[in-house]
Amino acid sequence: MCPSFHTTASVTTASNQADSDFNLAKLITAPAQLLAHNTMRLSCQAMQLITLEQEAQVEPAIAKLKEGDAPLFVLSGGSNVILPKQLQAQVLHPVFKGIEVLAEDEHSVSLEVMGGENWHELVLYTVNNGWYGLENLALIPGLVGASPVQNIGAYGVQLEDCLTHIKAFHLPTQKWHDFDKADCQFNYRDSLFKQQAGQWLITRVGFKLHKDATQVNADYGDVACLALSLAQADNRSAIGPIDVMHAIIDIRQSKLPDPAVLPNCGSFFKNPIIGTEQFAQLQHEYPGIVGYRVDEAHTKVAAGWLIDTAGLKGQGINPILTHAKQALVLVNHSALDSTTPASQADILATQQFIQRSIKDKFGIELEREPVWVDEQASYTAAP
């Protein structure tokens, strides 16, 4: 059921002003090949692509598009979706940009960021301005508007830690809504927007960031050690958020392939959460197993460690293989050395091969992280 929230007056006014001279045809590419619009570089032919350059275009565009029978599908940066060969849908591609300071004092700053802004560029912008909290999320691909859907996270930080509010358009009812953080129902790699996939177009995301350069989160992996070496190279004895950001960028660049060079959609599997008792049993058999206590009863296990330990790094079913340096990432080799683009079926073959292998060896079920889209633009949890 859709939560009930008040319409944003400023957004509604902007939309109404655009109605009189709105020309939908200027925004449409038809038919549209989406190969360049998804980081896995899967060939996907859609009915049409509607590029929304201004927030004021959202309401009139959707009103006109819904006069037809074809479903609507929101495609942001395309970094977390597995697309079909044919997509019988009208694809909405929001690219509007802008960053506004809503409030600021000596301790913090509140921002509102348009959904078309590049996520990593936002992280760089905030840290370089002395606004901290997003630095651990550096180099995550995609756009700001898609970040809440998956509640993106990395190196001990999740988006929800800094998020304050969201403005979004509900496609089924064609109404604007404001969400506080609590309304978003965030969980590990999950949110209301993911649970109600395909129903929302997020246009603005609000953040509250701090200005305390001594407050860092560097307890994850090798971040602290590398961040300290960066600080010392700059003649500083204590690490700051900028050191954490650059350390994470260095780590990610050393382990993760650039989607522009070797197509991928980032971490393909979620880190599974298992019972602490099961983890203790596995730890007895595999002393090097990597896990992080969630609570007294549950431990989160590093999926990459499981895949690597199972001997699956660099393995899979051509042309989709796990990356040679980071087993958690599936890469599409067909984009480099084949005239035949990879398909959903190719990805599914490698996905299920890895899932079976991990289940057989460790008794753990791996869950896919990117969302699966069928030809009718429906998001599916399976296969």
Curated annotation (Swiss-Prot):
- UniProt GO molecular function: FAD binding; UDP-N-acetylmuramate dehydrogenase activity
Q: What does the record give as the active site?
A: R189, S267 (proton donor), E369
- Cellular component GO terms held in the UniProt record: cytosol
Gene3D superfamilies, alphabetized: 3.30.465.10, UDP-N-acetylenolpyruvoylglucosamine reductase, C-terminal domain, Uridine Diphospho-n-acetylenolpyruvylglucosamine Reductase, domain 2
Q: Which residues form the FAD-binding PCMH-type domain?
A: 42-212
Named cofactor requirement(s): FAD
Pathway info: Cell wall biogenesis; peptidoglycan biosynthesis
HAMAP family (UniProt xref): MurB
This chain's protein is named UDP-N-acetylenolpyruvoylglucosamine reductase
The major lineage groups are: Bacteria, Pseudomonadati, Pseudomonadota, Gammaproteobacteria, Moraxellales
